Amino acid sequence: GYDPAPGTVKAQVNARGCELYGTWAQELGFLFCRTGSMVLGFNDEDRAHLEQLRRNGYVNGVPELSIVGPDRIHELEPRASADATYALWCPSTGFVDPFEVAIAALENAVANGVTFMRSAPVEAIEVAGSVDDARFTLATPAGNVRCRYLINAAGNGAADISHMAGAEEFQMVWRQGNIVVLDKEPRTLMPLYPVPTPVSKGVIVTGTVHGNTVITATAAVREPGDTQTYASD
């Protein structure tokens, strides 16, 4: 919640979602570790960026953010880089297994009456009514679906859905990332981030709920529709 620009929807849902994950984990039965995290800085320029992230987080409602020095960095995570001179310490950070969360959310949705339509991509959207009182008809190979509210959670297809619905026009940039999974190394207990850039949060070292460590991820730009697996970048 400290990275998104204040006032955006992402800023609002990041902070609130992080707050709720402990409750969701208990209610839905997935693993969740709240370890805290650090964004590491190595010079005065990085420190200025960390201070901006701290201010963002304060406005966005992220609790207990602070800038710490090298002694505190290595007290919190002894395996952090010895060259790190500053860090943004965020004690509320946690991590999950995203596959477990997706399955748990799906099961909970089914238990609450949600119907899933498989192999039913949206091919067209008809919009009727005014902007404030719209009605949507979604055409799919499995039949039409009518609704009053339409949530665009289509991932790489989000721009197409938005266009068909007559909503915001935007362009998707496809990226493919490689993740290194370490199955024999001792666990790094908290996520360690570099200072983010305008296009990426960089390569992150983090523990997992299963006890191992992952290094994630590259962000190679790919052509739209490219879903093939690449061995390396």
Located regions from the model:
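Dinucleotide-binding Rossmann-like beta1-alpha1 core, especially the glycine-rich loop
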Residues: 1-76, 85, 202-204
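Active-site substrate-recognition segment that forms the wall
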Residues: 23, 28-33, 144-145, 149-233
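Helix-loop-beta segment of a Rossmann-like dinucleotide-binding subdomain
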Residues: 29-39, 64-67, 74-112, 135, ...
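Short strand-connecting beta-turns/loops that link adjacent beta-strands
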Residues: 45, 127-133, 187, 210
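Alpha-helical scaffold segments in soluble metabolic enzymes
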Residues: 52, 104, 108, 160, ...
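General beta-strand structural signal in soluble alpha/beta enzymes
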Residues: 66-69, 116-118, 152, 215
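Helical element adjacent to the flavin cofactor pocket in flavoenzyme catalytic cores
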Residues: 88-149, 157
